[in-house]
From Swiss-Prot:
Positions of the YcgL domain: 1-85
SUPFAM superfamilies: YcgL-like
Protein name as annotated: YcgL domain-containing protein Ent638_2370
Top-level lineage group: Bacteria
One of the Pfam families matching this protein, by short name: YcgL
Matches recorded under Gene3D superfamilies: YcgL domain
PROSITE patterns for the chain: YCGL
Amino acid sequence: MFCVIYRSAKRDQTYLYVEKRDDFSRVPEELMKGFGTPQLAMLLPLDGRKQLVNADLEKVKTALKDQGYYLQLPPPPENLLKQHLEGEGKN
């Protein structure tokens, strides 16, 4: 199984995985509006892989099979001040 990964033109660190290059027919229109013009990031073989860097491999495969796409959102921002205060015991 291969997938094609696109980077969002509107949202930093947001990626859309689809089954075929330039085929967004199964992606909801509202999602595409918010995503912006997709920018090709890479073609990626999923078979034989044990993991992906920033996404759960099984969730990606299931989403591609069931709904035709997988949306990878950026991780939540770190609250360094909160971490520092908790480390200092001042929370």
